[in-house]
Regions:
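Surface segments flanking catalytic/ligand-binding clefts of nucleic-acid enzymes
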Residues: 113, 118-293
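Short gly/ser-rich loop at a beta-strand->alpha-helix junction or flexible surface loop bordering the NTP-binding
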Residues: 1-135, 154, 159, 268-293
């Protein structure tokens, strides 16, 4: 199954065990997000719990759980797969308060990628139910910053770092930036298919966020996955694209920005690649005729 899948199962089993022994409490934070099917930035090794009503934390410490104080209203609680948990917006807000910006952003973008109806306006409207706690303003700003195109936590990290570098002036020469853009290519057997790229800068510089999962065997035969990615990259390069791949270490450091700056400086300007399709990823997924074509 692979280490990644095993760790995910361990996460869910930990959450299940804690919930079984704490029947009056409600999951919140990253544990609730994972139970609701969202990606998290870090592995869940301790379960955040809250009590319905207006509760305070107490002194006893537990290795597998932590109790959070504050107001938890009935409308912020749901039951999912037999376990009581905070609704997603509250779980993500608590993740923001207790674990920081990056953890919350990964969860937000995971939710938005999986559920197209979760637009920025919809999520901001949902924050009206949240307690007037410290961090609410920053959380609302984070929602406005979030996107709906990140299919993985690594894509969220890369997207966020690039956008912040552009905004701060650390990364220059970016005239256009787009996410999840499709190109017509041929697969290894010669059949037409669509290659979706994670980030497209200036129309022709492609950034692919490659986590260990693609080549670990968790998504199928590892050697086959590597060969498939190499063929895909060659097809894109044949259209005039410049492809740069980044992993977790680069995406979380300035190495990503340095890599992109070198590439942009060496290849300035905007170009249009000939095999780009006009449909967005969301349009493609929801339109069977486009996929069939």
């Amino acid at each position: 199954v692979g280490d990644i899948q095993q760790r995910r199962q361990q996460e869910l089993e930990l959450i299940r065990q804690v919930a079984r022994h704490c029947k009056t409490a409600v999951l919140t934070g990253p544990a609730a997000a994972r139970w609701l099917g969202l990606s998290t930035f870090d592995w869940v090794t301790r379960v955040d719990l809250a009590l319905p009503g207006n509760s305070r934390t107490w002194g006893k410490q537990y290795p597998d759980r932590i109790y959070r104080g504050g107001m938890l209203r009935p409308g912020e609680i749901c039951t999912h797969k037999g376990v009581r948990t905070a609704v997603a917006i509250r779980a993500i807000f608590d993740s923001y308060r207790y674990y920081g910006r990056t953890e919350a952003l990964v969860q937000l973008e995971s939710a938005r990628f999986q559920h197209p109806h979760l637009t920025v306006d919809t999520l901001l409207h949902k924050t009206a139910t949240l307690p007037r706690a410290k961090g609410l303003r920053g959380f609302r700003e984070l929602i406005a910053h979030s996107g709906d195109t990140s299919a993985s936590a690594l894509e969220t990290i890369a997207r966020d770092r690039i956008l912040r570098a552009i905004a701060s002036g650390q990364l220059t020469g970016v005239e256009t930036i787009e996410f999840q853009i499709g190109f017509e290519v041929l697969d290894a057997d010669g059949w037409p298919t669509i290659a979706w790229v994670d980030v497209l800068i200036n129309g022709f510089i492609i950034v692919e966020a490659d986590g260990a999962e693609k080549t670990s065997g968790a998504m199928g035969d590892a050697e086959e996955a590597v060969n498939r990615e190499r063929h895909r990259e060659k097809e894109l390069q044949n259209t005039g694209a410049i492809v740069r791949r980044v992993g977790w270490k680069q995406a979380q450091s300035d190495a990503l920005i340095a890599l992109l700056q070198l590439c942009i400086d060496a290849h300035p300007g905007v170009r249009q690649l000939p095999t780009r399709i006009d449909a967005t990823y969301r349009e493609w997924c929801t339109n069977p005729e486009r996929r069939a074509g």
